[in-house]
From Swiss-Prot:
Function: Catalyzes the conversion of uracil and 5-phospho-alpha-D-ribose 1-diphosphate (PRPP) to UMP and diphosphate.
CDD domains tied to this protein: PRTases_typeI
Pfam families (alphabetical): UPRTase
Protein name in UniProt: Uracil phosphoribosyltransferase
Any Gene Ontology biological process: UMP salvage
C-alpha cells in the first residue's frame, strides 16, 4: 500500500509544536503551512518527469529533469482545518487548480461516537478533473475515522484522475487502514500514525481539534 510516513527530524519538530497545547493560534497555523509545503515537496518526488537537456550560461550542455506533472495538479481543500495546509501545498505547487469541499459529520446522540459515521457534503466546488491526466491532492490535517475522507473520495474517484494523493498531518491507524483497504491505489502522505481513537472519534494522542486551534 502506498503509505508515506514523513517522520523526519524537521517534520517531527513541527509536529511536536502542533501537539503542544501551549502553541498559540498564529503559530499553529504557521506550522500547518510549513508542513503543507514540506509534504508538497515530498509528493513532487513521486510525479512523472522527463529527462531534458539545457544549456548553461557558460555554453555547456547538461541533462536535467522536468517534472511535467507540475502542470497537472488539482488541490482539494476540506474545510476548514485544511486551509493553512493548502496554503503550504500551494507554495510547492503554485500552478495548481483548487477546489473546496465542505463536509460535516451527522451528529450522534450519546456519549460514544461510532467509528463508521454518516457524513454529508454541504458545499462542493471542484474544477474539472481531467481523466488520466490530473493528479488530485486532497488535504485534511487529521484523518481519524476516515468517514469524511471516504465521502470525499467517492466524488474524486468517479473522475478517474491519474493519481490521488491524501495529505494529512496525523492519521489514525484505523483511518489509514480503512482508506487504503478500500482504495489501495491511493497515495497517503502523513507525518505520523497515531494508534488510538477516543469514544468521540478524536485521535490520541493527536493535537486536539485542528480547526478550532487554527481559527478559534
Amino acid at each position: 500500500m502506498p503509505l508515506y510516513v514523513i517522520d523526519k527530524p524537521l517534520t517531527l519538530h513541527i509536529l511536536t509544536q502542533l501537539r503542544d497545547k501551549n502553541t498559540d493560534q498564529i503559530n499553529f497555523r504557521k506550522n500547518l503551512v510549513r508542513l503543507g509545503r514540506i509534504l508538497g515537496y515530498e509528493i513532487a518526488n513521486t510525479l512523472d518527469y522527463e529527462i531534458v537537456e539545457v544549456e548553461t550560461p557558460l555554453g555547456a550542455r547538461t541533462k536535467g529533469i522536468d517534472i511535467t506533472d507540475l502542470n497537472n495538479i488539482v488541490i482539494i481543500n476540506i474545510l476548514r482545518a485544511a486551509v493553512p495546509l493548502v496554503e503550504g501545498l500551494l507554495k510547492a505547487f503554485p500552478k495548481a487548480r483548487q477546489g473546496v469541499i465542505g463536509a460535516s459529520r451527522v451528529e450522534v446522540d450519546g456519549k460514544e461516537v461510532p467509528k463508521d459515521m454518516d457524513v454529508y457534503i454541504y458545499y462542493k466546488k471542484i474544477p474539472n478533473i481531467r481523466a488520466k491526466v490530473d493528479n488530485v491532492i486532497i488535504a485534511d490535517p487529521m484523518i481519524a475515522t476516515a468517514s469524511t475522507m471516504l465521502k470525499v473520495l467517492e466524488e474524486v474517484v468517479r473522475a478517474s484522475p491519474k493519481r490521488i494523493y491524501i495529505v494529512s498531518i496525523i492519521s489514525s491507524e484505523y483511518g489509514a487502514n480503512k482508506i487504503l483497504s478500500k482504495y489501495p491505489f491511493i497515495y497517503l502522505f502523513t507525518v505520523t500514525i497515531d494508534p488510538e481513537l477516543n469514544n468521540k472519534g478524536y485521535i490520541l494522542p493527536g493535537l486536539g481539534d485542528a480547526g478550532d486551534r487554527a481559527f478559534g
